[in-house]
Regions:
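Short, compositionally biased
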Residues: 119-132
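Mature N-terminal segment immediately following signal peptide/propeptide cleavage
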Residues: 1-18
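Cleft-lining beta-strand/loop regions that shape enzyme active-site pockets
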Residues: 131-132, 137-326
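Short, Lys/Arg- and Gly-enriched loop/turn segments at beta-strand edges
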Residues: 111-122, 146
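Extended, small/polar residue-biased N-terminal targeting/export presequences
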Residues: 17-83, 133, 144-187, 385-400
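Residue-level marker of beta-strand positions
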Residues: 93, 104-107, 133, 221, ...
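Low-complexity, Gly/Ser/Thr/Pro-rich intrinsically disordered linker/tail segments
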Residues: 356-397
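PDZ/PDZ-like domain segments forming the peptide/carboxylate-binding groove
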Residues: 66-107, 111-115, 204
Length: 400
């Protein structure tokens, strides 16, 4: 497994110097650590660390999936420099322990979360090394700091899925359908002047992008909500940009190991959206979402509001591998194959997009489930929306 991961990096990573890392030397150190490992979890950790050393948001090791599903029952996000709980699942241990939206997370198992390391927490605790219990230091609005231990819900599943079996196949498809429902696009209208398009992912076909734009073309202002949108397909990004300009747009330059070429979004011409555009982003807006925001901002096509984006814009390809013949174990590697250099000669990787107007919710806003950012955007567009009502439009959805 380590050899396969190393070979993927060696042959496919966009930077032939591997960011100054001696890949062969690091691989030998990893081999020795694997020999001393006492569990599969330790082995996976060694392999993962080899890739984490690249400090590249899109270069990661994905270990074999676990048969047990782990659910922590609470969700957090960084706003500005602070991390807050944004959702707590009903009837979870987190709810029983008194954890609530708006609680500021000071430490997770002794480590202070921040904008730079939060994604690593998710990677370790969800994919690499799930924990049955998480120790939290939290601060509720108007209260003193406290420490709680939150137990995760662990659901044991099947270790082997036979997709030729009807029952197993149906269970697998239901799981995919549940994921799809969490990522539904939604358009909300406010009178004749303002529409909000909640876009959770860049997962639409070109025709679907056009259809969505056609629905909102009549409004004077479109608010495109890309908060918590981690990106997606380049095809979707290019078509979306093409719908907001009357000319072709050179987004930037794709820099690969052996070539460079421009990334161009072709205009949809007179069929696109010609009116006012407001884009909402936050610290979870990544990849295609922040590239879109950057283009809108640099071309002065609209206003970008919210929080600084995540700064995770490298282009990557996922390489799937398997071990075994009759009983197959799958694992994979995401390898960055290109960087995107913007027209100013810089990459958004690590820096992100700073909004034209920084708007951050407070702990009190999150506790009251108010969406002050969306309410401010609607008001700026000439509409009216109470923050409490705004908070009900796109609530956090838990997987069944």
């Amino acid at each position: 497994m380590l050899k396969t991961v190393r070979d993927d990096l060696k042959s496919k990573y966009y930077d032939p110097t591997f960011r100054g890392i001696d890949l062969e030397a690091r691989s030998k150190v990893a081999e020795e650590r694997i020999r001393q490992a006492k569990s599969n979890g330790e082995v996976f950790g060694v392999i993962a660390q080899l890739l984490l050393d690249f400090n590249d948001s899109h270069t990661l090791f994905y270990p074999p999936a676990r048969s047990a599903r782990i659910e922590y029952g609470w969700q957090m996000q960084t706003f500005g420099d602070d991390t807050y709980v944004i959702a707590v699942k009903p009837k979870s241990d987190a709810e029983a322990k008194g954890l609530k939206p708006g609680d500021r997370v000071l430490k997770i198992d002794g480590i202070a979360p921040n904008r730079s390391n939060l994604w690593i927490y998710y990677y370790f605790y969800r994919a690499l090394s799930p924990r049955p219990v998480v120790k939290l230091d939290v601060l509720s609005p108007g209260a003193e700091p406290r420490q709680i231990e939150v137990s995760a819900k662990i659901t044991t599943g099947k270790k082997i899925f036979d997709l030729t079996d009807t029952i197993d196949a149906n269970a697998y498809l239901r799981d995919l359908e549940d994921e799809a429902r969490l990522n539904e696009h939604k358009i909300v209208e406010f009178g004749e002047n303002v529409a909000v398009w909640r876009m959770p992912s860049f997962d639409l076909t070109e025709d679907s992008v056009d259809n969505a734009v056609n629905k909102v073309k009549k409004f004077k202002t479109l608010i495109l909500d890309l908060r918590r949108n981690g990106g997606g397909a380049e095809e979707t990004l290019l078509r979306l940009i093409g719908n907001f300009f009357d000319r072709d747009i050179t987004i930037g330059k794709i820099k690969r190991r052996k070539e460079e070429k421009p990334l161009i979004a072709r205009t949809r011409g007179d069929s696109g959206f010609k009116n006012n555009l407001v884009v909402l982003v936050d610290s979870e807006s990544g990849s295609a979402a922040e590239v879109f925001a950057s283009v809108i901002q640099s071309e002065k096509r609209g206003a970008v509001l919210g929080d600084r984006t995540s700064g995770k814009v490298m282009r990557s390809r996922f390489h799937s591998h398997q071990i075994g013949l009759e009983t197959v174990v799958w694992y994979g590697v995401s390898v960055t194959d290109a960087d995107l250099i913007m027209p100013d000669g810089k990459s958004l990787e690590g820096s992100g997009v700073v909004p034209d107007e920084v708007l951050l919710p407070t702990g009190e806003d999150l506790r009251a489930q108010k969406d002050t950012v969306l309410a401010r955007a609607v008001a700026a567009a000439g509409g009216s929306l109470d923050p409490a009502e705004a908070g009900k439009l796109f609530p956090f959805k838990w997987k069944p």
